[in-house]
Regions:
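Bacterial N-terminal signal peptides
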Residues: 13-22
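Extracytoplasmic copper-binding redox domains, predominantly the cupredoxin/blue-copper superfamily
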Residues: 2-6, 22-119
């Protein structure tokens, strides 16, 4: 009976390389759920205006206006957040621990809204 080795089956060797690469990437994929997103508050709007996120992600709200104060908050049945008054250049951080759709509003600028879609 002939023995099989990697030299006799180059496709098998390629499959082994791909499998090893996939296994090496698996821990990195597990950590992708903890992503930090930067949201700019400037000109009476949030940029971006919609975000699709996962539980455990963090968003940082940065006041990019030179003179305007912002006041980001969320009021939901099972989740609340209040950044307080944010002077120009200041930032507030929020860790998303609940799944669902949430709207961040600005207490100073009522039409300023950011929709969060958290899975």
């Amino acid at each position: 009976m002939a023995t099989c080795n990697v030299r006799c089956h180059p496709l098998f060797a390629g499959a082994l390389v791909l499998a090893a690469a996939w296994l090496a990437l698996e821990p990195a994929q597990a950590n992708l759920s903890n992503v930090i997103r930067i949201v700019l508050q400037k000109g009476r709007h949030y940029d971006p205006g919609d975000l699709y996120l996962r539980r455990g992600d963090t968003i940082t709200l940065v006041n990019g206006d030179e003179n305007a104060v912002h006041h980001a908050f969320i009021e939901a049945d099972r989740f609340a957040f209040d950044a307080g008054d944010q002077e120009p250049g200041k930032q507030a951080t929020l860790v998303l621990r609940e799944a669902g759709d949430f709207v961040i509003q600005c207490g100073v600028h009522p039409k300023m809204k950011l929709t969060l879609h958290v899975q």
